[in-house]
Amino acid sequence: MQRRHVFTFQSRFVPMIINGDKHSTIRLPRTRVVAVGDIMDLRTWSGVPYRSKQTKLREVVCTEIHEITIREIYVFVSGRTLSYDEVAQLATSEGFRGIADMMLWFFANHSLPMTGTLYRWKS
C-alpha cells in the first residue's frame, strides 16, 4: 500500500525542486518509515515555519532509500565511502554550491557526524 509522506524544504532549495533539478533529500531518521514506492509530498512554508500555510511544490514517488553518514571529511552511503567526485556530485544535486557549502550547512543544522536517510525520486 502506497503511503504519503510530507517533506518540507527551506526556500533555498525550492527553485531546484520546482524545475526538477533536485531529485533527492537527506533527512534525519523519521518516526514514520518511508518505503520505496511511497508518495513524497514536497512542500515549503509560505511564510514563517509552523506559523504559515505550506505550499505544495511537487508530488513524487520514492525510488531509492539509503542510509547516509556525513562526517567532517567523509560521506558514507549504504556503508560505502564516496569518492571526492561523488561527494561533489551529491552536494550539487542536493542544491549546495559545493562540498564546503554542504558540510557547513549540515554542521550548522545537525552537527557532524550526522547519520540519516538519503531519499531519491524521479521527476
Predicted regions and their residues:
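Catalytic phosphate/metal-binding cores of nucleic-acid and nucleotide-processing enzymes, i.e., regions
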Residues: 1-123
